[in-house]
Regions:
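Extreme N-terminal starter segment of soluble prokaryotic enzymes
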Residues: 2-6
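Buried hydrophobic positions in well-ordered alpha/beta secondary-structure cores of metabolic enzymes
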Residues: 12-15, 71, 122, 162, ...
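Glycine-rich phosphate-binding loop
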Residues: 64-82, 204-237
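Short acidic, glycine/serine/threonine-rich loops at helix termini
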Residues: 19, 85-87, 131-136, 185-190, ...
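N-terminal glycine-rich phosphate/adenylate-binding segment common to multiple enzyme folds
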Residues: 51-145, 236
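N-terminal beta-loop-helix "entrance" segment that forms/cooperates
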Residues: 34-60, 217-219
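Glycine-rich phosphate/diphosphate-binding loop of Rossmann-like nucleotide-binding domains
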Residues: 7-24, 29, 140-213, 227
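Structural motif
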Residues: 7, 39, 72-73, 104-106, ...
Length: 237
């Protein structure tokens, strides 16, 4: 790209405070590119919780159009209303942004050299429990039902992202994190889908699996985590 447009979306609460300092850093590091017109920092307006509540839209149409004109989005935290709060019970704006822009991979690196930790997490970012937002079913006052959705194409593409990263960065294993011993269909299919991608296209990379509760409880256990490098997991985990 000859010119990169970075959309600036401060968000709610402490978001504008964080963004102010983030922009100080970005403007300093990219001052030459900004001066040369190769980088534009473009504010995106209309996305505060007050704006969204007034319009009754978690992701206003005009905001989405502004975002689509950008190459990169620098975003602060945005309020997702919870039952009992002053705001309407709207769907998460974060989730809608991800789905609208098809941002299916949340990539989270973790590096703690003194503990020999060099991990990269690939979280599927669109499906799972997040896919239906507030469209669950309140059967009675005592019974509510929400949904978990996991598709084969959704699993395959996040798996490919994880394996491609592993191969390009000299990693030798990918670990799948699920609760497939209990959530046997959605999580079971996710586990098998990742294994299939690995077996068919990345036979040089070892596939392991861990249960999400055990992984969380023992992330500080060097024996349990020894040798782990790249992780792939469904949305909620």
């Amino acid at each position: 790209l000859e010119r990169i447009v970075v959309g600036i979306l401060p968000g709610d609460g402490i978001g504008p405070i964080i963004m102010k300092q983030a922009l100080r850093v970005l403007e300093f590091l990219a001052k030459d590119e900004i001066a040369a017109g190769k980088l534009e920092l473009r504010p995106v307006s209309g996305m505060t919780i007050e704006d969204r509540a007034r319009l009754g839209q978690s992701l206003p149409d005009n905001v989405l159009e502004q975002v689509k004109q950008c190459d990169v989005l620098l975003k602060g935290p945005m309020v997702t209303p919870r039952p009992g709060e002053e705001w309407p019970n709207m769907v998460s704006a974060n989730s809608l942004l991800r789905r609208s822009l098809d941002l299916f991979a949340a990539v989270r690196p973790v590096s703690i050299p003194e503990k020999n930790i060099d991990w990269t997490f690939f979280r599927e970012n669109i499906e799972g429990e997040y896919i239906w937002g507030n469209k669950g079913i309140q059967v009675t006052n005592d019974l509510a039902v929400d949904f978990k959705v996991q598709t084969a194409p959704g699993t395959e593409r996040i798996a490919r992202q994880a394996f491609e990263f592993a191969r390009k960065n000299g990693k030798t294993n990918v670990t799948v994190i699920t609760k497939s011993n209990i959530v046997k269909l959605a999580d079971g299919n996710f586990l098998q889908g990742v294994r299939k991608v690995g077996a068919e296209h990345y036979p040089d990379i070892e596939v392991q699996d861990r249960l999400v509760d055990a992984m969380c409880a023992r992330m500080g256990d060097e024996t349990f985590c020894k040798g782990l490098q790249v992780f792939v997991l469904p949305n909620l985990y």
